[in-house]
Amino acid sequence: MSKGLVVLAYSGGLDTSCILVWLKEQGYDVIAYLANIGQDEDFDVARKKAEKLGAKKVFIEDLRSEFVQEFIWPALQANALYEDRYLLGTSIARPCIARRQVQIAQREGAQYVSHGATGKGNDQVRFELTCYALYPQVQVIAPWRIPEFYNRFRGRKDLMEYAEKHNIPVPVTPKAPWSMDANLMHISYESGILENPKNHAPSDLYQMTKNPEHSPDQADMLEIEFKKGVPVRVSHLKDGISKETPLEIFCYLNEIGGKHGVGRIDIVENRFIGMKSRGIYETPGGTVLLQAHLDIETFTMDREVRKIKQSLGIKFSELIYNGFWFSPECEFVRECVERSQKHVEGRVQLSVYKGQVYILGRESPKSLYNEELVSMDVQGDYDPCDASGFIKINAVRLREHNRLQGAALSKHNV
């Protein structure tokens, strides 16, 4: 008799294929679920593989459009950067994947969900917090945290032997000496030879971006139009190409940014579970959009509002990274950020060239930039004499600080 029905987040790779068979060995019926979030994957082959391994059903879900609109766009509005550098490509994808996983579980009457995330990483937290937030009654089977599983499979060699024994198709190409995770927003690389933070990334590691040294000698000049803080159109200023749907916009910017080697970073970051890890990331389209959004936002947003919004962006980044997308605090922050974008509207022109994004100009019907007010040639409503009082008022605390420091110094010299 079956122990119950499990929806497995299935990739078609060695790990989750072995997990699928292992779950069946444990007495579960398994539904294999594959999320298309823009990775390079032959989904028909993966479907046939899952069916051959005994999956009761296989669901392949195209989540690319909702990934862009419901996850990438809110992160862009917030200028979300974890620890000032990481654009959160993996972190944003996990709640998108897990949300559909629990939807399938609820629809199919499954009591369990399962994933192949390791017991040392962030993804286990992100998957499971999403599952519990959206389907509180669900039970999670995390094989890499179950002693019977991880003691049995201590490495790739054990998985390969298990696969051979159970007629699981195995990769015919040598495994790269690092792990890789890809989606529409980015590709991440970690583990293996990259675990030594001193090791340079091999030149053949990068798949989404060209080496800037070998990128075209001719820049691509683009215009990106924003409304309420999200891009609604991107146009090439020379060849006339224009994209308007969210998915088309993002894919096109990935193409242009990747061609010029934009968006590569190599960092050591702080995982939520307490350890530091090294990650190498390629995020071409996201990097182009971040620079454009920063520019139009500063152009149209009040200074003090933006200061508050910046602090919310930092908190939002931490919540995303740590797996709290569907928490009440993250919902609150998203709503605040969305409200801040009400007047973030206009066009930014930029150049993409050899690993860099150069802002060329901007215009907006809701700009707070007053050319006459700021001009050195026109006095306008601003009286330069008023600056004297402004400076004196701001100097009061500096003078008081100096007085205190002087008194302390005098006592020290006695």
Swiss-Prot record:
**So where does L-aspartate get bound?**
T118, N122, D123
Name one cellular component (GO) term: cytoplasm
Main localization category: cytoplasm
Where is the protein situated, by its record's location annotation?
Cytoplasm, Cytosol
SUPFAM superfamilies hit by this protein: Adenine nucleotide alpha hydrolases-like, Argininosuccinate synthetase, C-terminal domain
Q: Give EC number(s), comma-separated.
A: 6.3.4.5
- Which family does the record assign? Belongs to the argininosuccinate synthase family.
Reaction(s) this enzyme catalyzes, per UniProt = L-citrulline + L-aspartate + ATP = 2-(N(omega)-L-arginino)succinate + AMP + diphosphate + H(+)
Query: Has the keyword NADP been applied to this entry?
Result: no
Q: Any idea which positions bind L-citrulline? A: Y86, S91, N122, R126, S179, S188, E269, Y281
Do you know which CDD domains this protein is assigned to? ASS (cd01999)
| Name used for this protein in its record | Argininosuccinate synthase
